[in-house]
From Swiss-Prot:
This is 3-methyl-2-oxobutanoate hydroxymethyltransferase. CDD domains: KPHMT-like. It is found in: Cytoplasm. GO terms for biological process: pantothenate biosynthetic process. It catalyses: 3-methyl-2-oxobutanoate + (6R)-5,10-methylene-5,6,7,8-tetrahydrofolate + H2O = 2-dehydropantoate + (6S)-5,6,7,8-tetrahydrofolate. Coiled coil: none annotated. It comes from Synechococcus sp. (strain CC9311). Mg(2+) binds at D42, D86, E118. Residues 262-272 have a biased composition (Pro residues).
Length: 272
């Protein structure tokens, strides 16, 4: 899978599917399930590393997990999903050269084919333009942007006409700078639909309603593995409960076996 194929999917009306992975095991599951895109998201800071936000994750963390995800793929390269890696907080906001170095490190030292970054401010658009000129495919991300949690919180974005127009202008600027697709998170469905209709690149939603070119979800949320469930991602199974019960069953079995009295060995035969 290559980035250009997602644009062809949009043109043909085929829905785009994207799921997250963070290691070889989760990558193998997502690949076997048939996702078009595997996102190594900086959400692994919370899902895997136990942080409260995505901010503490480093470029080294993202590279480590992206390498593991790529090793988990088993299909021939042409049949593998597109692997996209999130650039972490402050790896691309502190200058163009640093952004190119960070993105280049991910693509050079893993088998990822693209990177994703958040925001649509002019400084971010300039980063996208530079990366694309350097041959690095970029996926954009607007709406609720977790790396801006201390400024925007985890609130729904684009809820009034002024902010909707701003997000639309930012989306157009990201497309003009060369983004091959755009994630929109936790925005009104009508805004996502407007973006889908006016942009030539795919609009992939999460908590943005059904009027998108595709959808992305955190795999751990879909499997019901996380302690708290986001409102826009209903679990498809109670994975946490099932896993805990399976572990409890094994632990009980081991303890019960140990507690069962064993038949003492027969006494040794007397010497003749």
């Amino acid at each position: 899978m290559r980035p250009a194929e997602l644009i062809r999917f949009k043109q043909s009306g085929r829905a785009i599917t994207m799921l997250t992975a963070w290691d070889a095991l989760s990558a193998a599951l997502v690949e076997e399930a048939g996702a078009d895109v595997v996102l190594v998201g900086d959400s692994l800071a919370m899902v895997v590393l136990g942080h409260a936000t995505t901010l503490p994750v480093t470029l080294e963390h993202m590279l480590h997990h992206t390498q593991a995800v790529c090793r988990g793929m088993s299909k021939p390269l042409a049949q593998q999903p597109l692997v996209v890696c999130d650039l972490p907080f402050l790896s691309y906001q502190c200058g163009l050269d640093r952004a190119v170095a960070a993105a280049g490190t991910i693509l050079k030292e893993s088998d990822a084919a693209a990177i994703k970054l958040e925001g649509g401010e002019p400084e971010i658009v300039a980063v996208v333009d530079r990366l694309v000129r350097m041959g690095i495919p970029v996926m954009g991300h607007l709406g609720l942007t977790p790396q801006a949690v201390h400024r925007l919180g985890y609130r729904r974005q684009g809820i009034d006409p002024r902010s909707q127009d701003k997000l639309h202008r930012q989306a157009q600027a990201l497309q003009d700078a060369g983004c091959f697709s755009l994630v929109v998170e936790h925005v009104p469905s009508e805004l996502a639909g407007r973006l889908r209709r006016t942009l030539s690149i795919p609009v992939i939603g999460i908590g943005a309603g059904p009027d998108c070119d595709g959808q992305v979800s955190v795999t751990a949320d879909l499997l019901g593995l996380t302690p708290s469930q986001p409102p826009f991602t209903p679990a498809r199974m109670q994975g946490r409960e099932l896993s805990i019960n399976a572990l409890k069953s094994w632990l009980k079995e081991q303890r019960d076996q140990r507690a069962t009295p064993t038949t003492p060995p027969p006494p040794p035969a007397p010497d003749c």
